[in-house]
Amino acid sequence: LKCPECGGIMHRVPEVIDCWFDSGAMPFAQHHYPFENKELFEKQFPADFISEAVDQTRGWFYSLLAESTILFNQAPYENVIVLGHVQDENGQKMSKSKGNAVDPFDALEKYGADAIRWYFYINSAPWLPNRFHGKAVQEGQRKFMGTLWNTYAFFVLYANIDNFDATKYTLDYDNLPVMDKWLLSKLNSVVKTVDDCLANYKIPESARALQEFVDEMSNWYVRRSRERFWAKGMEQDKINAYMTLYTALVTISKAAAPMIPFMTEEIYQNLVRSIDKEAIESIHLCDFPEVKEEWIDKELEDDMEELLKIVVLGRAARNTANIKNRQPIGTMYVKADKEMGEFYTDIIADELNVKEVKFASDVESFISYSFKPQLRTVGPKYGKLLNGIRKALSEINGTEAMNELRTTGLLTLDIDGNKAELSEEDLLIETAQTEGYVTEADGDISVVLDTNLTPELIEEGFIREIVSKVQTMRKEAGFEVMDKIHIYAKDNDKLLELMKNHKEEIMSEVLAEDMTLGTTDGYVKEWNINKEPVVLGVAKM
């Protein structure tokens, strides 16, 4: 080929440069640096972060680093988010020929953008491979997005009933009850955590913090506060509940907006823009929430966390005893690092349906211990004393022996004038629970349920079951939340007598204005309540 300028013969230069050179030159080549745009380049260099898939480790990541180091003796980026490859459900590479490839547009149409985004945020660290399949996406959608939406829907339902307008009230923190202060403390703690995690590119950690908060907001705060929203009128306690939940929903939506942009925008538009036309146009134009440090109460959060552990253990003890939560129990004993105040014990009692919660320094009296020698360790140590050790262990006071073992780390026995010192690894320890009591423990917390049921407790259990069945029938019959009803019952003299004696209590629980015993009408259903057959009916007034 001839040169168009001079007419001479052109020759290919012998040097060859890798095509990745162009990608590595991107930071300065895009600005024609150093020939122009010097200030603009220096303002943008190095980049805060770059992101690409893991195969770019030897490609773009390397070429950027190599060229920048040669030219500027400096890395061209401060952070790198490496993305693992998306695989199928079995961990195989997606391929059209294998038939395991997922069309992203089909997935978006089926699950929605937010659900897919959330799956990638919370599933694993960004640099690990992701096994993408519908069940995993739907599980994340249910646990976080579904819970957040249901909490939002709960608020909207009752706010509409009460014509609640958040712009007409202020959140008076100093006069809030403990449960409200706890939620606001957790809210600001999680905003702080998410902000810190995102600033440090810890994506799954920030997503998990959001999910944990939404779960506690829904399954603890809202569940514990429902009756405050159901109250008649607009008393201050009800206003406090509305304002606390409103603040939490709006704030957590702003914190989650970068991850689930569409759902949070919907929540923001309905909760904020619908009542305040002067509010910022979109949640994505709002600042990230600012942490109110003065609202963070770590002691309160720790106390509530311990309370939740006690409740979980109490539920486990109920399951072990095979006693449903609607059946009241007389007493629960708790051993913990510190005794909790009346506010907390009242919550525990209500959650676990027990009449009394007692803190005890020791619950060993409800547990018995028996010991046998661990032959593989005791045999070589003490040989001919083994039979004597076995006999001594069978006769020992189990509680005292266990206390000695925990205190000193050893159980000391006198075997015919010979001292035998046994550590925990030398012993086979069996525990048995005292009849009528069930024990559960986790770390430093132990709970004991007294499972002995008096006739009064059994009667109350029947009433709670009846209330539950009527509430179920209200839903099945399609009644609205605030509909007044008429209750009917027949075909079980024992239960009818109980319903007669507890008529007002039952009616108030299910929004009933009347009760007729001996006949049925409306929506009718047969039930077996604690092995007692009965026919119940509900009709809208």
Write out the residue ranges for each language-model feature.
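Cytochrome P450 heme-binding Cys-pocket and its upstream "meander" loop
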Residues: 32-41
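A short glycine/serine-rich beta->alpha loop
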Residues: 44-55
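Structured mid-domain segments that build the active-site/substrate or prosthetic-cofactor binding neighborhood
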Residues: 119-122
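Feature 926 captures the class I aminoacyl-tRNA synthetase adenylation module centered on the KMSKS loop
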Residues: 1-21, 25-27, 33, 71-109, ...
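Substrate-binding cleft of carbohydrate-active enzyme catalytic domains
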Residues: 66-67
